[in-house]
Swiss-Prot record:
Protein name listed in UniProt: DNA ligase
Alphabetized InterPro entries for the sequence: BRCT_dom, BRCT_dom_sf, DisA/LigA_HHH, DNA_ligase, DNA_ligase_AS, DNA_ligase_CS, DNAligase_adenylation, DNAligase_N
PANTHER family: CHROMOSOME TRANSMISSION FIDELITY FACTOR 18, DNA LIGASE
Active site, UniProt feature: K117 (n6-amp-lysine intermediate)
A biological-process GO annotation: DNA repair
EC assignment: 6.5.1.2
Chain sites annotated for binding Zn(2+): C412, C415, C430, C436
Any one annotated GO CC term: cytosol
SUPFAM superfamilies, sorted: BRCT domain, DNA ligase/mRNA capping enzyme, catalytic domain, Nucleic acid-binding proteins, RuvA domain 2-like
Length: 676
């Protein structure tokens, strides 16, 4: 049975991966994985949270949408959040979606509005008295970027709403998708290639990149198109009763909608539409990656309501992946931040899923053996949408006679440290830790992060420059950068003031806490909570370094596997060398005066709503200091819920489960008794 710490570690890993891919997709317009691969990560996290709701992390992306807005455009708050959609991938999932709706709307006739799922960039358009006044990207669903000047250059997008048979609303907010039709995309890439300029990987990247140009003239030169898919706000209310009517009304105002739209009276008809569009997909003028199914009746939509990040009344029905055959030319090993060795198949380039694929991750040695993939093999490569491609099938009948079974390397390909793979684990790791160059940059990023040593200003640009100058071989070198001041001044855009600010931040970081220091070391499986538990239990770094596995296992929040990871970390000689150098550089923390009182040790608490006297982060920290585990969701294991203003569904669930609830004043009084 998995220990809570291991479950949390798995959740944290998924959250970090999803955040990374959200940033690549929504902010950088450079998707790093396909939609199917992203969906798999997302569903893994949702499944863990459903099974262990008390361990749900506060920053889980299952309660958010998309990525953060870029700083170069003005940030705009959406009055009505721009939510994403849930996904279904087959007929069974589709019928389950319909059953959930029917259970919530018993004895009601349900019609479904079915539309193309356009592969573009979602935006919101604001009209006042029929005049376009603002265009905003979806961003993180709550806030987006003001791209008004760029959207005004889109040729088919109405700047003035006028129609003799339709009264123009005082205010109208229309949601839709900006994309680049296939022919326009091909012409743009051909022109760029002829001029020796960068070409785009796919139409979505081209559309998103065009909208985020600071110069509207660039957007104007691109063949962009806008297709409306819904109304967010309308004053006075439009009085329409269905999605189908809403879209037709928008066309009367001058908006274009996707070239296919269906009104289905049963979920079986929806499936038939899906199969029809799948056949017609190659002939469509635009790229699509599935279909969107919505309950057509707007009143029924209101009855069904929303989950935290998606409507209950709509879902996206994704198309299946595409497959192509190619040859494995080589298999090599890459080393990640935590030392994980990942085998990568180098392929004879093959066009699949709209892109040319030449590299595919094989994940781990177990997957290699499961597939029995070898150098020289013919393989089927699977790719759907923007999902990272993968090897789906090996064809042994085409295997070369001398093809050898792939073995796990005994030494790290980067630093030559021994490779270890504990019994029962799927992943092999370099044991080099802080010594390994491949792990170095991510280890440094983690070490300087806000929740670790919090060295303000030591961002990626600094780190990359310092690595290039060979001034950072490990995290301890950070505290010797003052010895290289003249070299630092040679870095582009790093003047005297920037260098001094960095020196000041490094000096300030020397005063920390034992818990922060333990967390900063980046020991596998040791997050903030575990680091705090280790600090409270062992009180000193020396005691932690000398602890055996049995002592570590007795620490709250530390399971058997994490205990072994901690023990192995402090057993590695090169890690101890780095620790000694950090301490010699002056990193210190207050000595423990007495064992920390933790009256809430082991209890699960939830903080929800808005608190007037403190933020939720501070409330969480106060509870954690008393030993509580602060969860993002309410379950039968929850001890107490602290409810501020607009507490919402968590308060409702707590009352339903008869869990103790404190208002803000009661919570402050509760904390006061431990403030002496």
């Amino acid at each position: 049975m998995m220990q809570p710490a291991d479950i949390v570690a798995q959740m944290r890993q998924l959250i970090q991966l999803i955040a990374k891919h959200n940033h690549a997709y929504y902010v950088m317009d450079q998707p790093s994985i396909t939609d199917n691969e992203y969906d798999q990560l997302f569903h893994q996290l949702k499944a863990l949270e459903a099974e262990y709701p008390e361990l749900t992390q506060a920053d889980t992306p299952t309660n958010r949408v998309g990525g953060q807005a870029l700083s170069k455009f003005e940030t705009v708050t959406h009055a009505v959040p721009m939510l994403s959609l849930g996904n279904v991938f087959n007929q069974e999932d589709l019928f389950a979606f319909a059953r959930r709706i029917e259970e919530r709307l018993p004895n009601q006739q349900i019609q479904y509005d079915v539309e193309l799922k356009l592969d573009g960039l979602a935006i919101s358009l604001w009209y006042e008295n029929g005049v376009l006044v603002r265009g905003v990207t979806r961003g993180d669903g709550e806030t987006g970027e003001d791209i008004t000047q760029n959207v005004k250059t889109i040729r088919n997008l109405p700047k003035h709403l006028q129609h003799h048979s339709v009264e123009t609303p005082r205010f109208l907010e229309v949601r839709g998708e900006v994309l680049m039709p296939k022919q326009g995309f091909e012409r743009l890439n051909a022109a760029n290639e002829a001029k020796g300029e960068k070409t785009f990987a796919n139409p979505r990247n081209a559309a998103a990149g065009s909208l985020r140009q600071l110069d509207p003239a660039i957007a104007a030169s691109r063949p962009l198109a806008f297709y409306a898919y819904g109304i967010a706000q309308c004053e006075p209310h439009h009085g329409l009763g269905s999605m189908h009517e809403s879209l037709q009304w928008l066309t009367q105002l001058g908006f274009e909608i996707a070239e296919r739209q269906f009104l289905c009276s049963s979920i079986q008809e929806v499936q038939q539409c899906y199969e029809q569009i799948q056949q017609e997909r190659p002939d469509l003028a635009v790229e699509i990656d599935g279909m969107v199914i919505k309950v057509d009746d707007l009143k029924q939509q209101q009855q069904l309501g929303f989950l935290s990040r998606e409507p209950r009344w709509a879902t996206a029905y994704k198309f299946p992946a595409e497959v192509a055959m190619t040859t494995v030319e080589n298999i090599d090993w890459q080393v990640g931040r935590t030392g994980t060795l990942t085998p990568v198949a180098r392929l004879q380039p093959v066009f699949v899923g709209g892109v040319t694929v030449s590299n595919v991750t094989l994940h781990n040695i177990g997957e290699i053996h499961r597939l029995d993939v070898r150098v020289g093999d013919r393989v089927s490569v699977y790719r759907s949408g923007d999902v990272i491609p993968k090897v789906e099938k090996v064809w042994p009948e085409f295997r070369p006679e001398l093809a050898e079974i792939v073995q796990l390397p005994e030494q790290c390909p980067v630093c030559s440290s021994p490779v270890v793979m504990p019994e029962g684990e799927a992943l092999a790791r370099c044991s080099g830790g802080l010594y390994c160059a491949a792990q170095r940059i991510e280890a440094i990023r983690h070490f300087v992060s806000r929740k670790a040593l919090d060295i303000e200003g030591l961002g990626d640009r600094w780190v990359e420059s310092l690595l290039h100058l060979d001034l950072l071989k490990d995290v301890a070198d950070i505290y010797h950068l003052h010895e290289h001041r003249e070299q630092l001044l040679t870095i582009e855009k790093m003047g005297e003031k920037s260098v001094q600010n960095l020196m000041d931040a490094i000096e300030a970081s020397k005063k920390t806490t034992l818990a922060r220091f333990i967390y900063a070391l980046g020991i596998r499986g040791v997050g903030e909570t575990t680091a705090r538990m280790l600090a409270n239990t062992f009180q000193t770094l020396d005691a932690l370094k000398q602890a055996d596995i049995e002592a570590l296992k007795k620490t709250p929040d530390v399971g058997d596997i994490t205990a072994e990871w901690i023990y192995d970390f402090f057993l590695a000689e090169h890690n101890i060398e780095v620790l000694d150098r950090l301490l010699a550089a002056g990193i210190h923390w207050d000595a423990p005066l007495a064992p920390t009182r933790q009256p809430l040790n082991g209890e699960s608490w939830v903080v929800t709503g808005t608190l007037e006297t403190m933020g939720r982060d501070e409330a969480t920290q106060r509870l954690q200091a008393l030993g509580a585990r602060v969860s993002g969701s309410v379950s039968s294991k929850t001890k107490c819920v602290v409810a501020g203003e607009k507490a919402g569904s968590k308060l409702d669930k707590a009352e339903k489960l008869q869990i103790r609830v404190m208002n803000e004043q009661e919570f402050l009084a509760f904390l006061a008794q431990y403030s002496a």
